[in-house]
Amino acid sequence: LVRGITVSCDVYFYQLGERMDLEDYYSYSKLWGLPKRTHIDIPNEAGGLVPNTEWYDKNYGKGQWTKGIMLNLAIGQGEVLVTPLSLLCFICGIANGGHYAVPHCVKAIGNDGEEAENEPEFIDMPMSETTLAVLQKGMRGVVEDEEGTGKAARVPGYEVAGKTGTSQNPHGDDHAWFVCYAPYDEPEIAVCVLLENAGHGGAVAAPIAGQILRYYFAERDGGTVAMP
């Protein structure tokens, strides 16, 4: 599984999908918050979609779909919908060891010279230490291993963990995804890049994420980064 994540091997995940039950897939996705809204302080936030048996029966009819749909779902395609923010929260949960903070646009509110900061609210992502370790190691390999699909997000002096994604689009060119966090051992920052109709995640989105990380660490460390 670690190598499957690192090299983004669809065939490996197809085989996992064949062995999975749709309801288990749905339950774990829901448990980890992927189809839910993040509750960021912006009105009309869109939710995601992870289909289950009831959804397929309603939209395709009972007996009109097969277990073959698991091949698409196993690589996050087909009917699966996630927002960049919900995916970023999921990645933060992996980086933090199984929990993430509810995102906010506003850090603090001032009134008459006083400032009141938002109290962080954390969401648990129930996940075993073994599962977390596998995901973290696989994502580190995506960026740091020579065979990784996200090498373009490397940052000199820091280890980065990430995951590339390429969403097929029936109406045009593929959508390019990349999510990451850094430093690997003591995470401080997480990034999600989505470029619609732009191509492959490793080739297009990962370099942008790497540039964002380089700016972040340069500013933190008092240095500068040249424009690409």
Residue ranges and their predicted role:
Residues 1-193:
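Beta-lactam-recognizing serine transpeptidase/beta-lactamase-like catalytic domain environment
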Residues 83-89, 204-211:
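Short amphipathic alpha-helical face segments that pack within enzyme cores
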Residues 114-123, 208-228:
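Short, gly/Ser/Thr-rich active-site loops of penicillin-recognizing serine hydrolases
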Residues 199-200:
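Short beta-strands and strand-coil junctions in structured, solvent-facing domains, enriched
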